[in-house]
Amino acid sequence: MGIAKMTNKLSLLLQKPYVHHQLSVAELVEKVLHRNEGRLTHTGAVAVTTGKYTGRSPKDKYIVEEPSTKQNIDWGTVNQPMAPETFQKLYDKVLDYLMKKDELFVFKGFAGADPKARLPIQVVNEFAWHNLFVHQLFIRPSAEELADHEPQFTVICAPNFKADPAVDGTRSEAFIIISFEQRTVLIGGTEYAGEMKKSIFSVMNYLLPEQGILPMHCSANVGQEGDVALFFGLSGTGKTTLSTDPKRRLIGDDEHGWSSRGIFNIEGGCYAKCINLSREKEPQIFDAIGFGAVLENVILHDATRVPDYDDGTLTENTRAAYPLQAIKNIVDPSVAGHPSTIVFLTADAFGVLPPISKLTREQAMYHFLSGYTSKLAGTERGVTEPEATFSTCFGAPFLPRPAVEYAEMLGQKIAEHNVRVFLVNTGWTGGPYGVGSRMKLAYTRAMVQAAVEGELDNVETVQDPIFGLAIPAHVPGVPDDVLRPQNTWADKQAYEQKAKELAEKFRANFQKFAHIDPSIEKLGGPLV
């Protein structure tokens, strides 16, 4: 089936009388309740469950192997190839399945807040709550924009269609397939809404570099003087917490592009983790979960319909989706100038990386490519040994192109705009996990504030003997002793041993970048 035939079949489907186009939030909430897809919370949010898939399914994600894009994709475990004929057969089956439904829901909008770089998208949903989710997460068009809207990419999401691996060429019943030639994302077998969001992010990660725009998995905010800061970091490093600052306005919490004009948010909403959420800890997120927000896998108290954010029975990965406009302190539209500061966040459970260090351009590229943090493996079974995790460019699951392309773009932009870059360790101090303690949030906030406000630009620094990083000798509001990891360990020999152990893990991980300019590792990596 060629692209024309596929397009015809889709337009035939979208003309059916039972297809609802561009419903409002209130209409979608009514549909969700009427169809028994979810329940209303005491604030008017919609609470839903996603069945057995409570997170992304990276092993079920494919990119169609097509002549026009084949040479540009970094094929492997992240970007698994699928034959065009396999995709087309499955596409046909999914559309036949959707033709038999009583109701379908279509949203048209945009990915990318910069009008010159945005991608017009449409999303076709089997579930009303999924359509509400994309309405809140992507950029909603004005009436004029809707009248001229020509979708450049279509997401078709049919969670109740289960693939048959023996027949359909998939690994399981679930599948997330991107075809760049057919400008289509096909999702089935999973109800987890994050797949729709991250599929479009993967699409933008492929398309934006063609326009000289760097796509980034980061949060971004702007100060009173218009100074922009970016925060990169893997899950659990403090990206959302540290970029939410009463003195700075939020541009976005997760996905951004950096063009020759500056920074823009790719999305129109937030998809915030909400396990253990409280108004005291995260007032902006807590208060944003109002009418029309979507709560995924959050348990409600039966009588009051009040969410119990501390209950991780279904998953620790509970989520809230809401539009950016639900937050008071935002930049609207979500565009800003070039960043003056970039912060890489890591939670080092080995307790050896400095709490803050200034990076050279080569070190910035090295640590961007490394994407290091650590996770605590199996603590519930009494295994307390931390595990080093490396996720290239702080977003490996969403990068269709070779990582080096993104790193080189970052390096060029840092040099061009004279951006200061810091590595901030929000993890352990005074010893590894189990011996030391977690870095105090008040100290981390003080360090980030000093970095972003330019207070560390001319400060005296000391070189870390193992990682070669420039550690500020003084940071306002932080004891000097805390700044140098070896000073916080009682056993200096144990510190050196552990630091060398982590340095070796960095080296081993970096071997996969054999084709990169050797000066990046030589000037950017550990000294030992």
Curated annotation (Swiss-Prot):
InterPro entries according to UniProt: PEP_carboxykinase_ATP (IPR001272), PEP_carboxykinase_C (IPR013035), PEP_carboxykinase_N (IPR008210)
Top-rank lineage group of the source organism: Bacteria
Pathway annotation from the record: Carbohydrate biosynthesis; gluconeogenesis
Binding-site positions, ATP: 198, 217, 233-241, 282, 319, 444
Cellular localization per UniProt: Cytoplasm
Record function comment: Involved in the gluconeogenesis. Catalyzes the conversion of oxaloacetate (OAA) to phosphoenolpyruvate (PEP) through direct phosphoryl transfer between the nucleoside triphosphate and OAA.
NCBIfam families named in the record: pckA, PRK09344.1-2, PRK09344.1-3
Protein name: Phosphoenolpyruvate carboxykinase (ATP)
Annotated source species: Geobacillus thermodenitrificans (strain NG80-2)
